[in-house]
Amino acid sequence: MKLIVKVFPEITIKSRPVRTKFIRQLAKNIRTVLRDLDPAVVVNGVWDNLELETRVTDPKALKEMGERLTCMPGIAHFLQIDEYPLGDFDDITEKCKQHYGDALAGKIFSVRCKRAGKHAFSSMDVEKYVGSKLRRECGAAGIDLKQPEIEVRIEVRDKRLFVIHSQHNGIGGYPLGALEQTLVLMSGGFDSTVAAYQILRRGLMTHFCFFNLGGRAHELGVMEVAHFIWKKYGSSQRVLFVSVPFEEVLGEILGKVDDSHMGVVLKRMMLRAASSIAERLHIDALVTGEAISQVSSQTLPNLSVIDCVTDKLVLRPLIVAHKQDIIDTADQIGTGDFARHMPEYCGVISVNPKTAAKRGRVEHEEQEFDMAVLERALANARLVPIDRVIDELGQDLQIEEVSEALAGQIVIDIRHPDAAEDDPLELAGIEVQTMPFYAVNARFKELDPTRQYLLYCDKGVMSRLHAHHLLSEGHANVRVYRPS
């Protein structure tokens, strides 16, 4: 299979050195992301696009390649093509006929040709000749350039002919690794996950920072969605997941800060901590999912007071986004269900929160705060490579595993819905239910407590994590299914 990868249009207007740098980075990213599917994949760069060739023929692997490319920053779209040496107009017609002939019978169609290089003919010359001959020889109903039922697309490049089968849109942006790095503050909800996606989509490499206010289930949920975002949109780069224990910080705020200023002070402490971590990682920008006035701490006066504690640039890609638009985007990118099932820990509830906090008053409230508590939280922060975060969580858990399901037991497939649909788990004589891993904590309590449940995933890591959490919650009827 051969693909022509069209780069993000804004790359093409850069200076020659910058353009070359970006296209080389994109080629490197493509090789990295596709390496496990085809170690020998060939990616060659030219001035405004990349040419990708693979000898892989497995339809499932080819589909996965396409899905990964559609989610890779830097790609405007890509074309699946067949390449031939350029012949005369009759030869071009014959090649088009091989691929489109059967589909044109009784249809209204058009021919579109793009051309690059020096030729004695124009693109329109090709379109007129090929279109006229295909109409006569393929039994087409007619030609309509504005509303064709079928569009025959070809490209002529110097002495090569490309017959285009399909076009797949990408997400645009710049290739990861070509621009600077950021640190996104993650809660795992709609806002922070969409903000992380927007930053990745633009081409900024994103590390993840989570402030744990006391919920183990919440930490697990945020790790899962951060790993999902990285795997789908940013896996060409190695980034970190940072978990900061903030329970003691929260306790200090609850005990020493006036109720009306708790939310703003908590955000300032988080920004201080994130700035310290960013400094360690040589990162100059922080990212949050805040939107103007969505909650009391997100009014313009409060955001201004919050930002006073850091010299870092604070990026808020959702600052003027409406909540429903954010939710719709989360559903489109695959994080919506994660957010809906995200365990919450709400330890700061202001009865009458200030919507226009004054900097002087906030600083006065913070005078009683013991900053040693914040320093301890930073000292105990865990920095884990995002590609190992799930494995590391599950490696020391002692959970009973079974290699065979028995009659009466129910196997719960907790893989992502896409994986469960592509490769359904079927066991003779055994009931199999699907329940995505991000919904397990919320939905397991709805199941019949008298039955025995076996959690299943591909590697056994996610199933061990969720089985461990369910057991700690008092559900004794859960095991892990690891078929031999």
Swiss-Prot record:
Source species, domain of life: Bacteria
Residue ranges occupied by any Rhodanese domain in the UniProt entry: 405-483
Annotated disulfide bonds: C346-C457
CDD domains named among the record's database cross-references: PPase_ThiI, THUMP_ThiI
SUPFAM superfamilies registered for this protein in UniProt: Adenine nucleotide alpha hydrolases-like, Rhodanese/Cell cycle control phosphatase, THUMP domain-like
A molecular-function term among this protein's GO annotations: CCA tRNA nucleotidyltransferase activity
Main location group: cytoplasm
Pfam families the record matches: ThiI, ThiI_fer, THUMP
EC number(s) from the headed UniProt entry: 2.8.1.4
PROSITE patterns (UniProt xref): RHODANESE_3 (PS50206), THUMP (PS51165)
Subcellular location: Cytoplasm
GO biological-process terms attached to the record: thiamine biosynthetic process; thiamine diphosphate biosynthetic process; thiazole biosynthetic process; tRNA 4-thiouridine biosynthesis
Involved pathway(s): Cofactor biosynthesis; thiamine diphosphate biosynthesis
Start and end residues of each THUMP domain: 63-167
Principal EC category: transferase
Residues the entry annotates as binding ATP: L185, M186, K267, G289, Q298
Catalytic activity, reaction form: [ThiI sulfur-carrier protein]-S-sulfanyl-L-cysteine + a uridine in tRNA + 2 reduced [2Fe-2S]-[ferredoxin] + ATP + H(+) = [ThiI sulfur-carrier protein]-L-cysteine + a 4-thiouridine in tRNA + 2 oxidized [2Fe-2S]-[ferredoxin] + AMP + diphosphate; [ThiS sulfur-carrier protein]-C-terminal Gly-Gly-AMP + S-sulfanyl-L-cysteinyl-[cysteine desulfurase] + AH2 = [ThiS sulfur-carrier protein]-C-terminal-Gly-aminoethanethioate + L-cysteinyl-[cysteine desulfurase] + A + AMP + 2 H(+)
Function: Catalyzes the ATP-dependent transfer of a sulfur to tRNA to produce 4-thiouridine in position 8 of tRNAs, which functions as a near-UV photosensor. Also catalyzes the transfer of sulfur to the sulfur carrier protein ThiS, forming ThiS-thiocarboxylate. This is a step in the synthesis of thiazole, in the thiamine biosynthesis pathway. The sulfur is donated as persulfide by IscS.
Family recorded in the similarity comment: Belongs to the ThiI family.
This protein's name: tRNA sulfurtransferase
Gene: thiI
